[in-house]
UniProtKB/Swiss-Prot annotation:
Leading EC class: ligase
Source domain of life: Bacteria
Residues reported in the UniProt entry to bind ATP: K241
EC annotation from Swiss-Prot or TrEMBL: 6.1.1.17
Subunit text: Monomer.
Gene from which this protein is expressed: gltX1
Keyword set, alphabetical order: Aminoacyl-tRNA synthetase, ATP-binding, Cytoplasm, Ligase, Nucleotide-binding, Protein biosynthesis
Gene Ontology terms, MF aspect: ATP binding; glutamate-tRNA ligase activity; tRNA binding; zinc ion binding
Native source species: Helicobacter pylori (strain ATCC 700392 / 26695) (Campylobacter pylori)
The protein's name in its UniProt record: Glutamate--tRNA ligase 1
Length: 463
């Protein structure tokens, strides 16, 4: 088997969104699984729209999710001399030509074609032009597309694709200012980089016949193509920012783990049996672009949150502390190691993201200043207040290093007073945490410690 070489080639005109990252992941997995090469190429030939910040954001996203590329990043803006050489080569071999048609002439031609209900297109009028060029016109360079031929390729996702060259006009490969066009530079770079397999979005499917024309004109080897359907929202519409089409780095800020995001995106358009959770090693062992789905996949926040919660639960306390550093939450330095372990172990089971986990840390460690109204209103204060007063005294005698002792103290109140557990547990929870839900009460008491637990009960009794 020949060396597999893939690439990811974004344009730095905006942030890297999840559709782009998914494409990068597919290319990365295919190359790495086959001990091949994976390159990053920045397609920055549109100098008016390029953004250094966008290019840096792409690199930053790669670093975060752990996609390591081979060699140096290739910037197309540094390769204009190479492109000019190949444009000249095509001109010298009479495979391309200068077209002197003005924009006004081209617009007029298109209007005439529309009036005749024809597809607007350039009519190849300068294809065999031998006369004197008109003055004042900076020409473009067009490729001579072979006529009456069928361009066919077997797409790894779409299957057999055939296009008659008569449907293509002699498309532009160099603008009037000499800058090369997208399809031209992509073809040159893919060929010179030795790209064997191109995995990209199916919005590029219409570009492929044009690129094959160029491959053949330059006697380059044509790579394998895999055109992946786009990601849709759960209503079957194009992704909007609200539905997930946002900067990849925003997911880090929202508290998603890179392992969860990579797993999630790899499953959008690819599957293996009914398995949902994949480590990177499993993805490398199982991924094959031939298994990519031909129908669009749907972005599901529910699925992403479920996966993230799964990965969150499997993080150690030390790993969680590292991951939580970018987020704002209460100081943990007053907790002993055992309390810290209990806090994070309890909360990671109840959190879907790091951001949510940070908020839940605050919910436990910051004393409530108000209490959940609907729960408070249901309390029988004549019964509750004496119970909490009695329990406060028990806590002063309790061993807070032993969770079972704390549990026994709560059970003792319930048994002595001959009441239902909820009649005591609910007001105690409200006193400690300010709301009717949250972590277990023995956990809360253990984490807060004697002094803080007693103080919170006293504050509640004053209300």
């Amino acid at each position: 088997m020949s060396l597999i070489v893939t690439r990811f080639a974004p344009s730095p005109t905006g942030y890297l969104h999840i559709g782009g990252l998914r494409t990068a992941i597919f290319n990365y997995l295919f190359a790495r699984a086959n001990q091949g090469k994976f390159f990053l190429r920045i397609e920055d030939t549109d100098l008016s729209r390029n953004s250094i910040e966008a290019a840096n954001a792409i690199i930053e996203a790669f670093k975060w999710v752990g996609l390591e590329y081979d060699g140096e990043i290739l910037y197309q803006s540094k390769r204009f001399e190479i492109y000019k050489e190949y444009i000249q080569k095509l001109l010298d071999e009479d495979k391309a030509y200068y077209c002197y048609m003005s924009k006004e002439e081209l617009d007029a031609l298109r209007e005439e074609q529309k009036a005749r209900k024809e597809t607007p297109r350039y009519d190849n009028r300068y294809r065999d032009f031998k006369g004197t060029p008109p003055k004042g016109i900076e020409p473009v360079v067009r490729i001579k597309v072979p006529q009456n031929e069928v361009i066919g390729f077997n797409d790894g996702v779409k299957g057999e694709v055939k296009v008659n060259t008569n449907e293509l006009d002699d498309f532009i490969i160099a603008r009037s200012d000499g800058t090369p066009t997208y399809n031209f530079v992509v073809t040159i770079d893919d060929a010179l980089m030795g790209i064997t397999d191109v995995i990209r979005g199916d919005d590029h499917l219409s570009n492929t016949p044009k690129q094959i024309v160029l491959y053949k004109a330059l006697n380059f080897k044509i790579p394998n193509f895999f055109h992946v359907p786009m990601i849709l929202n759960e209503e079957g519409q194009k992704l909007s920012k609200r539905h997930g089409a946002t900067n990849v780095m925003d997911y880090q800020e929202m508290g998603y783990l890179k392992e969860a995001l990579v797993n999630f995106l790899a499953r959008l358009g690819w599957s293996y049996q009914d398995k949902e959770v994949f480590s990177m090693q499993e993805l490398l062992e199982l991924f094959d672009p031939k298994d990519l789905n031909s129908s669009p996949s749907c972005f599901s926040w529910h699925k992403l949150n479920w996966l993230n919660a799964h990965y969150l639960k499997n993080q150690s306390v030390q790993e969680l502390l590292k991951l939580l550093k970018p987020f704002s939450f209460s100081d943990l330095s007053h907790l002993n190691p055992t309390q810290l372990d209990r806090l994070l172990d309890a909360l990671k089971e109840r959190s879907q993201t790091l951001k949510e986990l940070a908020l839940k840390i605050d919910e436990v460690l910051i004393a409530p200043v108000e209490y959940e109204e609907k729960v408070f209103k249901k309390l029988n204060q004549a019964l509750v207040m004496p119970l909490l007063e009695k329990f406060k005294l028990e806590l002063n005698k309790a061993n807070f290093n032993d969770e079972s002792a704390l549990e026994n103290a709560m059970r003792q109140i319930i048994e002595e007073e001959k009441i239902k557990a909820g009649s005591f547990m609910q007001p105690l929870r409200l006193a400690l945490l300010g709301k009717g839900g949250g972590i277990g009460l023995k956990e809360a008491l253990f984490i807060l410690g004697k002094t803080e637990s007693v103080k919170r009960i006293e504050d509640f009794l004053k209300n």
